[in-house]
Design a protein with these regions (language model features):
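Aromatic-lined carbohydrate-binding surfaces of glycoside hydrolases
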Residues: 24-176
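N-terminal carbohydrate-binding accessory modules
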Residues: 1-23, 38
Length: 176
């Protein structure tokens, strides 16, 4: 954005990016009131028109992506996610989900691996293009934390159909 001295009409606030150099998108990954499906759709459609090419669904309020990550989404929520993924694809936007496998790094044994693989199958069925494993906002008091998180990311990458796998570590700044 450029500093402007005169009011600018809203339609001129979004500059058209060069798709050759920038991969713009939105990460819906914040605390607070989540968007409604209508708000989410309107935002995605508007930003698709401005050259944004991915949408990562990861609201902190979606308990089935955080503390209750092992549980599948209820049918109504899963249907809404599926419709949104289809709409993203129809608008040329890659669809992704940010999963925060709460406390899974503490015991990444057979049971947890099976739960993660099962969850990834459910998410893949939505037409997942992007998968993000989000370890931010979690405890990080283990000397093996980075090793476990890397192990989980590798496992997820091997068990998803998503073409891109991203991660956000517990510590991503100088101070924990």
């Amino acid at each position: 954005m450029h500093a402007l001295s005169t009011p600018t009409p809203p339609e001129r606030l979004v500059e058209q990016p060069s798709t050759e150099t920038v991969d713009l998108g939105i990460v819906e990954g914040y605390f607070g009131r989540p968007w409604s499906w209508a708000e989410r759709e309107a935002t995605m459609v508007f930003l698709a028109g401005a050259g944004y090419r991915f949408f990562l669904y990861a609201p902190k309020a979606d308990v089935h992506l955080r503390r209750r990550w092992r549980e599948p989404h209820p049918d109504a929520e899963l249907s809404a996610l599926r419709r949104f993924a289809e709409s993203c694809h129809a608008h040329g936007v890659r669809f992704g989900v940010g999963l925060s496998p709460f406390e899974a790094w503490r015991d990444f044994g057979s049971e947890t691996r099976q739960a993660l693989a099962s969850r990834l199958r459910e998410l893949d069925a939505l037409g997942l293009d992007l998968l993000a494993l989000l370890f931010d906002d979690m405890r990080g008091d283990s000397p093996e934390l980075a090793v476990r998180q890397a192990e989980m990311v590798g496992f997820a990458a091997a068990h998803t159909h998503a073409t891109q796998v991203w991660m956000c570590p517990t510590y991503y700044a100088d101070a924990p």
